[in-house]
Amino acid sequence: MLALTYHRSVPAFALVRASGGNPEVATSALSMLHLGDVPEPELPAAGWMRVLPSLSGICGSDLAAIGGHASLYLDPLTSYPFVPGHEVVGVLEDGSRVVIEPALGCVVRGIEPVCPRCAEGRPGLCYNATEGPIEVGLQTGYCASTGGGWGEVLVAHPSQVHAVPAALTDEAAALIEPFACCVHAALRGGASKSDVVVVVGAGTIGLLTVAAVKMFTPPKRLIAVAKHPTQRDLALALGADAVIAPADAFQRIRFATAARRLDGVDRSLLLGGADITFECVGRADSLSDAVRFTREGGVVVAVGMPGDERVDWAAIWQRELTVMGAYAYGSEPKRKGRRTFELALEAAPELHLERLVGPLFSLGDCRDAIAYAMSAGRLGAVKVAFDLRG
């Protein structure tokens, strides 16, 4: 089958990182990413299914790995070479449309009894990511055994497969996985109707977090920080009460929360601020901003995949902030244990998520696709994806 594969190569990673993630280097013959014919993944156990991807998104975590600036923390939790692509809508061999829930927890791996985290309905935190009939991997798209959405075939356990409602186009369904991540983040943040909430970043994760917060935990006021015009328009359409530019964010959040400003030697801080801030970029500057924007005793939710970033912990310490990660999905205790993917699939039709998707590229145009995705915001795009429908 035709697929893009990502290979573990320290020299290639160092070369790409030294280039600053230049797309010409990151997709060259000297990089970790290769396009070619590879064997189809084998069914690892009885009951597993073959899935033919239709659309598969290019995620920020994919770009971080391809661009050489991903955190190496995840390397031992990954097997190589793998076919990327964990945002997938596809078809089963009987023609039915499905989306894939990528987490490779105990149930998927056939491990009994399940580990404590899987028993809690948190397969993304599975203790057994190295065990069972498939190789190491937290998710489909980072596991050598399963394939991924950037190939013509992947394999999935029945527990990973969700039927796509007729009301959803393929384009909208391609965003169910990241939307489920954001639903999980919104529920972890737990905003109340008296809270002021700030979402930092308005790429795919930021925009979908705006939508998830508005739908599942609507606050008193929801403010999005967005850099580009298309992002600002979409943030408002998805439920933000106000959208502000990064350069104006500190002052605008100060006024919105009636906070006081104190100027120091090299930076300013707020006395007061947002009750909850969702950080949806994963860079040091945006993480630092999220901390600065949040009131004493408030909550910062890290939703965007961070790299090895430096953050000044003094503010976290002195302000007694609660900083929490929001990774993947599972079952949501605040929704009577319902699966995050089910919540996302039910909520998605009214959001018209297809407006966030495009342009679409063939696998053969992967170099153009990656380059476009690396500059998506500036180019007026949100989710660039591969189209394998033929």
Task: Identify the function of each model-found stretch.
Residues 39-56, 71-120, 165-167:
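Glycine-rich beta-strand-centered segment in the early N-terminal region that forms part
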Residues 178, 201-205, 305:
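Glycine-rich Rossmann-fold phosphate-binding loop(s) that bind the pyrophosphate
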Residues 196-202, 215-285:
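Adenosine-nucleotide cofactor-binding segment
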Residues 255-267, 271, 309-359, 367-368:
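C-terminal substrate-binding/catalytic core of Rossmann-like NAD(P)-dependent dehydrogenases/reductases
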Residues 2-4, 13-18, 267, 271, ...:
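C-terminal capping/lid region of NAD(P)-dependent oxidoreductase domains
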Residues 75, 86, 106-200:
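NAD(P)H dinucleotide-binding glycine-rich loop of Rossmann-like/cofactor-binding domains
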Residues 181, 205, 231:
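Hydrophobic/small residue at the entry helix of a nucleotide-binding pocket
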Residues 294-295:
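Helix-to-beta-strand junctions that scaffold the AdoMet/dcAdoMet cofactor pocket
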